Amino acid sequence: MNIAIVTGASSGMGREFVLQLSGYVQVDEIWVIARREAALESLREEVSVPIRPIVLDLCESASFDTVASLLEAEKPNIKLLVNAAGFGKFGAYHKVSLEDERRMIDLNCTALVMMTRLCIPHMAPGSHILELDSLSAFQPVPYITTYAATKSFVLSYSRSMNRELKNKGIRVMAMNPGWVKTEFFNHAFQTNGDGEVQYFNRLYEAKDCVATGLKDLYKTKKDYSVHGLPVKIQVAMVKLVPHRFVMNIWPNQQKKPKNNVGLTTDGK
């Protein structure tokens, strides 16, 4: 049985991957992983491919035992893995709880590595892995410090794994969008959008970012993908300008009048 697996599939970018992936890969079933069962079940009404909801919290280590057992029992051929589960918290380091710090690292880094490692033995040549990353991967970003650091890890891990798996015919690509209109913001703000992070100069649509990511995954040899000319310019800039200067840009932007470009104060 040929399958695709998408984590973080209940909303946002993960859900959009489920909606669009059939344009690039033909599978018998899509395994969708997230915590909210109802949101996963509702995907059955939106795609023609059979959906298998798997309700798991990927911050919990026992979840990977469940995934390993399912893979061992069914022995599917995984054509595509999309690791889209993740979250971030905005604000000065001392305002982010230690529990949120731990969960960011567990979900953004540990879960991504565990899912990748568990799936590779069930992948044949021609299979693909997409690791959802962020523009913040390319430089340190004060006031989203831990989130940005986890995304730097994802970029490095993805590019290295793409090289390691080349001889197996398995392609790995990081996808590095700018800010995207998703539920991410519902949880990222500390309180009602107040605090050190208030200003966003641009938000992209999830469907457009996902379309670019899938196209780059299947139609190019890139090991990371960015969507939108302004984002591409920023990535080029941080390669040329010393990071000690780049790190001042984000805090200086936050001194501008609050402008969440379409977000309400609770991030929606």
Where are these regions (language model features)?
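SDR active-site lid
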Residues: 167-229
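Residue(s) in the substrate-gating loop at a strand-loop-helix junction
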Residues: 134
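Active-site helix of classical SDR
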Residues: 116, 150
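Conserved NAD(P)H cofactor-binding loop of Rossmann-fold oxidoreductase domains
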Residues: 84-89
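Conserved glycine-rich Rossmann-like NAD(P)H-binding loop of the short-chain dehydrogenase/reductase
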Residues: 22-42
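Substrate-binding pocket helix/loop in short-chain dehydrogenase/reductase
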Residues: 92-94, 100-102
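Conserved glycine-rich cofactor-binding loop
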Residues: 10-11
